[in-house]
Structures are given as structure tokens and as C-alpha cells.
């Protein structure tokens, strides 16, 4: 009996399969936060009563469980699927399409469709597999025009891959540039940007948050701003210094004459500017690159303003540096000589910046153009040269130092002459012992003269000693001749003179650039201050007279007559 009532039920199930079919995609994949539409068609036998559709998770209880989507208003859906899963077909519809919005990772799984109402059927053999993966899409940033400094430009951030049926995304802009928000749509946001030169190369970020899932994505774009050259600088290096120095436009630079110089021009611009150099003279110059100017050996004529020009499509700008060349300080002189009743001295100096000259007499300073009864100073300058002359007509009772001093740009050079007491030269040119004459000598020359005198005295002393030794030998051998009355000294003369020491001093260049030097007269003579001391002499002896008759005795000694001549060395 039990099998009797089961047979009609089995037959009814078989009949139920006739006329039921489900056409749906077996599986779909969707990125997190996005939407997916699953097309579905269901076929079932006609019925006069209402027919509702339901989508359940695999394993759910069709009677007590909640579907994820349904068109039955009396049936509540699963809480986590509420507002996101939609059954697109209405009551008694053959449309079983499923729309999943704001997909979440928990949505991954298998689903089946069921009919309920006047028709009841579950399509568990036609399952739908849903896979939710991580979101890989990012926003798009579109620049409507070229970014030019100072010009307002619109930028658009959009998420065309998002679905309008889902929760509207939230747009955020991040930039250091001057911006303001423009028009907004569901899937796009507009930004008004006014770029500046400093915005070139900076980042602009559009960030999109999908609130339905809490997922946030963003895109960052580097701004390329077109602007004219600005902030020009010049990097310099010179001499043996391997380091560099950066100068702002209008700065000054001073280097030593003969040093090498490198000037590198730098400009901030986009696109990169074309660089060129201008210099104050027509002298050719060397360019390693268009931006670098080189002077292998700086000369005074290289002084002046050097101008670098930078130019691109947006404009031009220049930068300059003023170059001054500092030449070595050279002191020529002093040179002195007696002229008339005074001592005339002159001194010259060459340098750049132009030097200045002054005289120092003892502790006093003589400079400029000045005059009194004792001295006269005349100074002049032209270009790199400074000249000064000094006339001294004063007397000195003790030694004094006379210096010529040149200075330029914190550099000083000095040359000193020693003035000593001595006989003064009168108008007639004769020596007057009652008055002293100013004597000058450069210290170095004086030492050399003293050394020469010492060597000469040593030489003469040795020579005299040799002569005296020879005379003694001759006197011993011819002692008997001295008794001969025919043997007489006809003449004997002794002369003496003062020893004069001259101190020639190197002359100075009378005109700038002259390289010739004129010989100067001796600066002074040293008088003989030890008149009472005996002087060293050497003498040669010769005897002259008639020859005596030849003695009969051949062994007799021969007599020679001569005269004695004494000469001073």
C-alpha cells in the first residue's frame, strides 16, 4: 500500500520537469565595489495564479531561509544582500536576471533560482557561480588643454568602469597648485587649475572612494607646466679651486690675472631654454657647451659684464655677472740720484685695481702732491700705473730710512733706502767737510759692496806679503851693492786717494709698460774716515845706472843700478 501512493507522486515530479527550463550563465566574475548583471530566462507552465521568483544561496532553506533577491513583496531578503541584489523580472515574468551592485567579497558563492506561488520549482541543476575579486581599476585624469603658467585649465577625473546604479563614488583632489572644484556628475569630477612655475613637476592626485564597499582607489599624475625662463643663476669656478660657487644675477666676481675661469649659466624654464653668452669685448671665447663660457687665462681686457640670455617659447630672461681682474702688485724702484742741491728719487707701481704710492721718511709719511722747504712730492696715476717723485733738500745728522710704499686692494709692498751722513756736494761740486751730504744705499747693494771690499783687501794683503818676502831675499843677496856710491835712488813717490763706493740703484719705468731701464749715477760716495791709519801698498824695485868696468876677476859680484818706484794698489 505504501508504494501505491508514492507512485502518483513520482509521476507528478516527472510531469513537473516538462515545461521547466532555466537559461543562465554558469559563472560570473566581478571586481569588488562594481556591478554585474547576470542575464537569465526561465520557462514554466502557464498558471492562473501569481508566480514569484527567488534567488537563494546554495544550501539555503527555501522555506525558512531568506533569499538574496526576490520579487515577492511579502518575503524579506538576506540582510547583507539588501539593496545590492536585485531580481529584474516582475511577478509572473519569465525574466530571472540578477543584478548585483557594490559587489563584496562575501558575495562569492553559488546561487540557484526558484519559482514559488501557483507554480513551484527549484532549478538546482542550473546553478550560478559568482566570484568577487579585488578592484584593479583606477580613475582616469584628463587635462583639457596645455598647462601654461597663469592660465586656468580644466581637469577631469572619471570612473567610467563604475556603475551608475551603485552607490555614487566620492571624489577627492590633492594638489599643491591653486585649484577649485568645477562641475560634478555621478562618475566624474571637474577641477579648475591655475598652474604656476613652481607647480611644474608636482603631483596631482584624484582619489575615488566607493562607499558601498569602502574601497578607495586613486591616480596620480605629474603636472607639466609651460613657463618662461626664471630664477637664472651663474655657477662659477676659477683657478685651482675644484669647488664651485653659485652667483645670483648682478653679482660681482674678482679673480687673479692669469687664472682660469668657468661660467655656467643656469635657468629654470619649461621647455628648457636656449642659452647664449655675451661678453664686453670682441675677443673670441671658448664655449664647452652653450651654457658654459671658459677663459683659460684671464687678462685685464677680459674685465666687464658678462650676460647670459635664456629664451624659450614663453619668453626670455638675462642674467649677468661683473668680472674684475686683479693683477699682481708690482713695485718698481725707488731709484735715486743727486741732481743740483738735492736728492731726487722716483718710484712706480703697477697693479689692478690701480695702486697708490706714498713715501715714508723715518716716521713721517709723504704722499699726494705736497711741498715745503725740505721736500717736494709729486704723484700721478694712469690706468694700472701710479708714479711718484720725491726731491729731498734737507740734511740729516744721523741715519734715516726712506721707503716707497705701494698698496692696492689690501695688498702692500715696500722698498727701503738707508740715508747716511756724509760730505755735502757744493754748487761747485767740491767736497766740504764742514757739512754732511746725504748718502743713499739699498741694503742689498751695500752688503754686496762690503763683501767685495773685504775680498779685495784679503787679496791685496796676500799679494803684499809675497812682495815683502821677495824684497827681503833680494836685499840679502845684494847687500854689498848698497855700499856702492854709484848706486842711488833717483826718485821715490807715494800717492793716496779716497776709496769711493758707489751704490747704483735699479731705475724704474718712467712710463707704463716700459721695460727699459736707464743707468743711474752712483747714489753716494763713502769718504775716507780713517786718514791716520797706514794704507797697504806694494812696490816694485829696479836699479838703473852706468855699468861698471868688467872686473878681471870673473868671480866678482855684478852690480845693478835701478830706481825704486812705489805704486799704490
Curated annotation (Swiss-Prot):
Domain Ig-like C2-type: 139-224, 229-324
Membrane-protein topology: Single-pass type I membrane protein
GO MF annotation: an example: sialic acid binding
PROSITE patterns xref list: IG_LIKE
Location relative to the cell: Membrane
Motif (ITIM motif): 536-541
SUPFAM superfamilies from the UniProt entry: Immunoglobulin
Protein name, entry field: Sialic acid-binding Ig-like lectin 5
Organism placement in taxonomy: Eukaryota, Metazoa, Chordata, Craniata, Vertebrata
Gene of this entry: Siglec5
Amino acid at each position: 500500500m505504501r508504494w501505491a501512493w508514492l507512485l502518483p507522486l513520482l509521476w507528478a515530479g516527472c510531469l513537473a520537469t516538462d515545461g521547466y527550463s532555466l537559461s543562465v550563465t554558469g559563472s560570473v566574475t566581478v571586481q569588488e565595489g562594481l556591478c554585474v548583471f547576470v542575464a537569465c530566462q526561465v520557462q514554466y507552465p502557464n498558471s492562473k495564479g501569481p508566480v514569484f521568483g527567488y534567488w537563494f544561496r546554495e544550501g539555503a532553506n527555501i522555506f525558512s531561509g531568506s533569499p538574496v533577491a526576490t520579487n515577492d513583496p511579502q518575503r524579506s531578503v538576506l540582510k547583507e544582500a539588501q539593496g545590492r541584489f536585485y531580481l529584474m523580472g516582475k511577478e509572473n515574468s519569465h525574466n530571472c536576471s540578477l543584478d548585483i551592485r557594490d559587489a563584496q567579497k562575501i558575495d562569492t558563492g553559488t546561487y540557484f533560482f526558484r519559482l514559488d506561488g501557483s507554480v513551484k520549482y527549484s532549478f538546482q541543476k542550473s546553478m550560478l557561480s559568482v566570484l568577487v575579486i579585488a578592484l584593479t581599476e583606477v580613475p582616469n585624469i584628463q587635462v583639457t588643454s596645455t598647462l601654461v603658467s597663469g592660465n586656468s585649465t580644466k581637469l577631469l577625473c572619471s570612473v567610467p568602469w563604475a556603475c551608475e546604479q551603485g552607490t555614487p563614488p566620492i571624489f577627492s583632489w590633492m594638489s599643491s597648485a591653486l585649484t577649485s572644484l568645477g562641475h560634478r556628475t555621478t562618475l566624474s569630477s571637474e577641477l579648475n587649475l591655475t598652474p604656476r612655475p613652481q607647480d611644474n613637476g608636482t603631483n596631482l592626485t584624484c582619489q575615488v572612494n566607493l562607499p558601498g564597499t569602502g574601497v578607495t582607489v586613486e591616480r596620480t599624475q605629474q603636472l607639466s607646466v609651460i613657463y618662461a625662463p626664471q630664477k637664472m643663476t651663474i655657477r662659477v669656478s676659477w683657478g685651482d679651486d675644484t669647488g664651485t660657487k653659485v652667483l645670483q644675477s648682478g653679482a660681482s666676481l674678482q679673480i687673479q690675472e692669469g687664472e682660469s675661469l668657468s661660467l655656467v649659466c643656469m635657468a629654470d624654464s619649461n621647455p628648457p631654454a636656449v642659452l647664449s653668452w655675451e661678453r664686453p669685448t670682441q675677443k673670441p671665447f671658448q664655449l664647452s657647451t652653450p651654457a658654459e663660457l671658459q677663459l683659460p687665462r684671464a687678462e685685464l681686457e677680459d674685465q666687464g659684464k658678462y650676460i647670459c640670455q635664456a629664451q624659450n617659447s614663453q619668453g626670455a630672461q638675462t642674467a649677468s655677472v661683473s668680472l674684475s681682474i686683479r693683477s699682481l702688485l708690482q713695485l718698481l724702484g725707488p731709484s735715486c740720484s743727486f741732481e743740483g742741491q738735492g736728492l731726487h728719487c722716483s718710484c712706480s707701481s703697477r697693479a689692478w685695481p690701480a695702486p697708490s704710492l706714498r713715501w715714508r721718511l723715518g716716521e713721517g709719511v709723504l704722499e699726494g702732491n705736497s711741498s715745503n722747504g725740505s721736500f717736494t712730492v709729486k704723484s700721478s696715476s694712469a690706468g694700472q700705473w701710479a708714479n711718484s717723485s720725491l726731491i729731498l733738500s734737507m740734511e740729516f745728522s744721523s741715519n734715516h730710512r726712506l721707503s716707497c710704499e705701494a698698496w692696492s686692494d689690501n695688498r702692500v709692498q715696500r722698498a727701503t733706502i738707508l740715508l747716511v751722513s756724509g760730505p755735502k756736494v757744493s754748487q761747485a761740486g767740491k767736497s766740504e767737510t764742514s757739512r754732511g751730504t746725504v748718502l743713499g744705499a739699498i741694503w742689498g747693494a751695500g752688503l754686496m759692496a762690503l763683501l767685495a771690499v773685504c775680498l779685495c783687501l784679503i787679496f791685496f794683503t796676500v799679494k803684499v806679503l809675497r812682495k815683502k818676502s821677495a824684497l827681503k831675499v833680494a836685499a840679502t843677496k845684494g847687500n854689498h851693492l848698497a855700499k856702492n856710491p854709484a848706486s842711488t835712488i833717483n826718485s821715490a813717490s807715494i800717492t793716496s786717494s779716497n776709496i769711493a763706493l758707489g751704490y747704483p740703484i735699479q731705475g724704474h719705468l718712467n712710463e707704463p709698460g716700459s721695460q727699459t731701464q736707464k743707468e743711474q749715477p752712483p747714489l753716494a760716495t763713502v769718504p775716507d774716515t780713517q786718514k791716520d791709519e797706514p794704507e797697504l801698498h806694494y812696490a816694485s824695485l829696479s836699479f838703473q845706472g852706468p855699468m861698471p868696468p868688467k872686473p878681471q876677476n870673473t868671480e866678482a859680484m855684478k852690480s845693478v843700478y835701478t830706481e825704486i818706484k812705489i805704486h799704490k794698489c
